[in-house]
Amino acid sequence: MSDSPSISAEERKRILRERRAAKMAKGNATSRLNTILTQGNSVKDVSSVKSVLDQEPTGATATTTGNHDLDPDHHDIEGFINTPGINASNDSVALSNSEDIDEMFKKIFGGQVPGNGTDGAGSEDPLAQMMKMFSQPGAGTGTNTPFSEDPFSAQPEEFKYQQQLVQYNTYRHQVWKFRFLAVRYFALLANFIYHFYIIGDSISFASSSHQFIRELIPVEPARSFFTLFSTIEVVIIASYYFLGTKEGFFSTATSNNFVVKLLDMGSMVLPQLQQFKTIAVRLLGYYELLAVLLGDLSLVVVLFGLHSVLGN
Amino acid sequence: MGILAALDLHPYTLVVSSFTVLLIQQLVGFIGKSTIQEFAWLFYLRVGGKLGLSNSFVAHTKKQEELHKLNREKRSISAQDEYAKWTKLNRQAEKLTAEVKSLSDDIAKDKSKINSLVGVVLLFLTTLPLWVFRLWFRKSVLFYLPTGVFPYYVERVLAIPFFASGSVGLTVWMFAVNNVISSVLFLLTFPFKPSVPIPIRQTKVEEVVPESAESKESSPEVIDIADAN
């Protein structure tokens, strides 16, 4: 082999290929193959492998199966057994049995994947597809959740990043919850204390364990308590909803919800369930708003309850 | 009111006691049962030792010190040169090890006793009173809201499940107290929680390989097996 720096890699490959082809054309392929196979063996000539280059061309075995005589003198039953789908189209006839099974499996699993089974995505492992569907809490919600990208294409760093993002979103949700809670409690306490002191009357704005308190005629300022309460609630709930939709922490909060997880699992069997997931996430968001209202009402109830103790 | 009167309980007593029980329950949940059990065990070791309750722990400490001393002595001598002494020490060490083991078992039993005692105390402090309240005072009105403060529909909601409008029963009261205490705990503890920083995505920077080097890599040395033979 004369190596000169002027010869390019492609040219060198071509020359080697030609030399190899010329060597093969000389014959003795079987003896050469046996020499290669028995390299390192202490006992020589133990291999009796025959090279395909020295085999006699058998002719009409595999390739001519498609050219059947439509009216033969006698029917070869074996031909019916071995020939895959004699009634099928001529394209599929050339496939061997094992190839047929592989193709059949590919078609079956490819057809179950949403989209089509012929493209790159469709020809993936069906188990991986199922897992992908299972681990997509943000799918179908229309929100940009951390899992909206393909988790299986992610590297370990990417996966770590996604985990950190989930933690960060949860923390951000808690921060907003804390801020709103502080504002709510401050406003409600201010409202309660204001009415408690402005009315002055020890009975009109007082709860009691005695039923007679219900028989008293309500004073006007007492009515404004609920007006102010509802105003505070409307403002706070509207702002919370606005921020929740803008910052996307409703979807973060609901992604771990049991109902959403159940829908995720169900959609693996019944893909139509994905459309209900959007509704479920929205309803859970509304439930959070209702929880804000109930929480504020709870504070007022507790204040009145404790006041009933102090009044006795 | 009938049961309250029979037990000579005023509704405000019920308000206060249920509030206290729920507060304790929330605090226990917040601190954690296992942490309380650990504290109780440490308290038992500290106080019980002085009162002569946890003798096994004191004995265990003494025996362990003795064992440590014996082992050190045993290591300092040669088993071949002073075989008799070494065997004597070894026998003593084995005996002490067995004693330490039995004392350890006693301590483990003591600890499980303390844990179960704490569990029973917590049960009597938190869970049982709430069940008693629910069973005995489920029909008792705890307090009445002032007239005109809430509209009718809100009063109706607060009178759940079957009280007259404007009154508050145990169900609503317990729900409200639980809600408020957990919110207050959240307000008090959240500022002390460590903040989570914004994650930064690590992008992979591909190294720029010179074209000549790349072509060299893509076409490795071809080994002609046929040539070799």
UniProtKB/Swiss-Prot annotation, chain A:
Top-level lineage group: Eukaryota
Pfam families, per the entry: GET2 (PF08690)
Membrane topology category: Multi-pass membrane protein
Spans through the membrane: 176-196, 225-244, 289-309
Main location group: endoplasmic reticulum
GO biological process, one term: retrograde vesicle-mediated transport, Golgi to endoplasmic reticulum
Subcellular localization, as worded in the UniProt entry: Endoplasmic reticulum membrane; Golgi apparatus membrane
Keyword Secreted: no
Subunit structure of this chain's protein: Component of the Golgi to ER traffic (GET) complex, which is composed of GET1, GET2 and GET3. Within the complex, GET1 and GET2 form a heterotetramer which is stabilized by phosphatidylinositol binding and which binds to the GET3 homodimer.
Protein name according to UniProt: Golgi to ER traffic protein 2
Organism in which the protein naturally occurs: Scheffersomyces stipitis (strain ATCC 58785 / CBS 6054 / NBRC 10063 / NRRL Y-11545) (Yeast)
UniProtKB/Swiss-Prot annotation, chain B:
Organism superkingdom: Eukaryota
Membrane topology, as annotated: Multi-pass membrane protein
Keyword Cell membrane: no
Region (Disordered): 210-229
Membrane spanning residue stretches: 15-34, 123-143, 168-184
Chain segments annotated as coiled-coil in the UniProt record: 60-117
GO biological process, one term: vesicle-mediated transport
A Pfam family the protein falls into: CHD5
Composition-biased stretches (Basic and acidic residues): 210-219
Positions on the Cytoplasmic side per record topology: 35-122, 185-229
Cysteines paired by S-S bonds: none
A GO term from the CC aspect: GET complex
Cellular localization per UniProt: Endoplasmic reticulum membrane; Golgi apparatus membrane
An example molecular function term from Gene Ontology annotations: protein-membrane adaptor activity
Keywords associated with the record: Coiled coil, Endoplasmic reticulum, ER-Golgi transport, Golgi apparatus, Membrane, Transmembrane, Transmembrane helix, Transport
Lumenal side: 1-14, 144-167
Record InterPro entries: Get1 (IPR028945), Get1_fungi (IPR027538), Helix_hairpin_bin_sf (IPR029012)
Subunit comment: Component of the Golgi to ER traffic (GET) complex, which is composed of GET1, GET2 and GET3. Within the complex, GET1 and GET2 form a heterotetramer which is stabilized by phosphatidylinositol binding and which binds to the GET3 homodimer.
Task performed by this protein: Required for the post-translational delivery of tail-anchored (TA) proteins to the endoplasmic reticulum. Together with GET2, acts as a membrane receptor for soluble GET3, which recognizes and selectively binds the transmembrane domain of TA proteins in the cytosol. The GET complex cooperates with the HDEL receptor ERD2 to mediate the ATP-dependent retrieval of resident ER proteins that contain a C-terminal H-D-E-L retention signal from the Golgi to the ER.
Alphabetized HAMAP family for the sequence: Get1 (MF_03113)
Family, as annotated: Belongs to the WRB/GET1 family.
Protein name: Golgi to ER traffic protein 1
Source organism: Scheffersomyces stipitis (strain ATCC 58785 / CBS 6054 / NBRC 10063 / NRRL Y-11545)
